[in-house]
Amino acid sequence: MAAITAALVKELRERTGEGMMDCKKALEKAGGDIEKAIDDMRASGAIKAAKKAGNVAAEGAIAVKTDGKAAVLLEVNSQTDFLALQDDFKNFVAESIEEAFAQKLTDAAPLIASRESAREALVAKCGENVNIRRLVRVEGDVVGAYLHGNKIGAVVVLKGGDVELAKNIAMHVAASNPEFLDASEISAEAIEREKNVFLQLNADKIAGKPENIVENMINGRITKFKAEASLKEQAFVMNPEVKVGELAKKAGAEIVSFTYFKVGEGIEKPVDNFAEEVAAQVAAAKQ
């Protein structure tokens, strides 16, 4: 049995939104296996679905630049959304993405190094910490990108088709955040877990039903799971009557890859305790 650490309880709480004690009990029951704990909580009806790991809010901006053959996605973080809306921060982000694209950088490390002086100057001026967090560069036959409000960015690489198609699929990715490119990428383990959760959640409904009926119900749930999780199987947001994979195929294109960035994924933002803050200010005033 894995140790039930505070960090593990905290992660489960962030992924499910449930209380600390409920998360601790679920982990103890699951022997410290966080994925099993999530499945058990779903099966018991405690939660409808687990949030993706690290889905914690933070501030900043996503930037994207493409020329139709390559694209760069960049995330720069700030402590507050107020700063993210200011021209000084926007200029820093714009200059950073331009440099990253021009230098054909494939990760954030060299950009962090070259932009350090500019970052320090921005921090000194605004009084907030600013960090270049991550960067991805993709190249291909056809590359399209979409940016939603500087908070979500997506790029799609196609073989065949055109930039407009790639951009439209990138828009879909930004809206739907698929987990997989194709249903074939979904592991047998993930499918088996989904099946077990379904059986536990619907134990009363399937009790006494013929085996073939139960099998059909399971297959229906797995088909829905695959459609929800894989890009090619999802209904296209601009025309739900067609799947994304079919859309690309009709245009003579093949979806090679996609990348999705959302500001703050995986970053824990401190939550201020207003009562403690007031108490601290009162205590300081008495000194």
UniProtKB/Swiss-Prot annotation:
Domain of life: Bacteria
SUPFAM superfamilies: Elongation factor Ts (EF-Ts), dimerisation domain, UBA-like
InterPro entries reported for this sequence: EF-Ts_dimer_sf, Transl_elong_EFTs/EF1B, Transl_elong_EFTs/EF1B_dimer, Transl_elong_Ts_CS, UBA-like_sf
Region feature Involved in Mg(2+) ion dislocation from EF-Tu, mapped onto this chain: 80-83
One annotated GO molecular function: translation elongation factor activity
Chief location: cytoplasm
GO cellular component terms, semicolon-separated: cytoplasm
Keyword Protein biosynthesis on entry: yes
UniProt keyword annotations, A-Z: Cytoplasm, Elongation factor, Protein biosynthesis
Function: Associates with the EF-Tu.GDP complex and induces the exchange of GDP to GTP. It remains bound to the aminoacyl-tRNA.EF-Tu.GTP complex up to the GTP hydrolysis stage on the ribosome.
Family membership: Belongs to the EF-Ts family.
Protein name, entry field: Elongation factor Ts
Organism listed in the record: Pseudomonas entomophila (strain L48)
Originating gene: tsf
